[in-house]
Amino acid sequence: MSNEENQQKVVVSLEDLLAQADALKKYIDYLQKTYAELQDNIMSIDSSLQALKELQNSQELLMVGDKRGNVIFKVQGIDKAKVLVHLGLEYYAEVDPDFATKVLNDKKSELSNVLSNVEKELAKSLEAYKEIADILNQAQQQLQAQQNKGG
């Protein structure tokens, strides 16, 4: 067999490539949004873990009223023996801080694994998008060259 026989050529229309690029762009946008949400969740868990550490070391705790810190409460007289930890969905459990730390660390580990997978998928999708964009750019350059020769 000659080298030419080993190479397979695939013919794809420009319309199909454009449709693929559009679908891939939407998928990339979805992955980027998911990535940002996962990072935000991990940062929230880190904040909760830090709050649990502070709880054990202080008489007074500052509690942020919202994500942006528009209002902060000074809280005293907290029962340091029990905290409520989110288990998932709408379920919370009253547990000791050490168990809450374990739950949060497990959650963080799971989210970090998902984040890693999303990051890999995002990299593959961006590479595929770049390849399609390169093909489309080459096709556009060839078309312009043909128009310049003819016109």
Curated annotation (Swiss-Prot):
Cellular component, GO, one term: cytoplasm
Annotated GO biological processes are: protein folding
Q: Specify whether Aminoacyl-tRNA synthetase is a keyword of the entry.
A: no
Record's keyword terms, sorted: Chaperone, Cytoplasm
Q: Kindly list the GO molecular function terms attached to this UniProt entry.
A: unfolded protein binding
Record's subcellular location: Cytoplasm
Enumerate the Gene3D superfamilies for this protein.
Answer: 1.10.287.370
Q: Which Pfam families match?
A: Prefoldin (PF02996)
Which SUPFAM superfamilies does the annotation name? Prefoldin (SSF46579)
Family assignment? Answer: Belongs to the prefoldin subunit alpha family.
Q: How does it assemble?
A: Heterohexamer of two alpha and four beta subunits.
Record's function text: Molecular chaperone capable of stabilizing a range of proteins. Seems to fulfill an ATP-independent, HSP70-like function in archaeal de novo protein folding.
The protein, known as: Prefoldin subunit alpha
Taxonomically, what lineage is the organism? Archaea, Thermoproteota, Thermoprotei, Sulfolobales, Sulfolobaceae
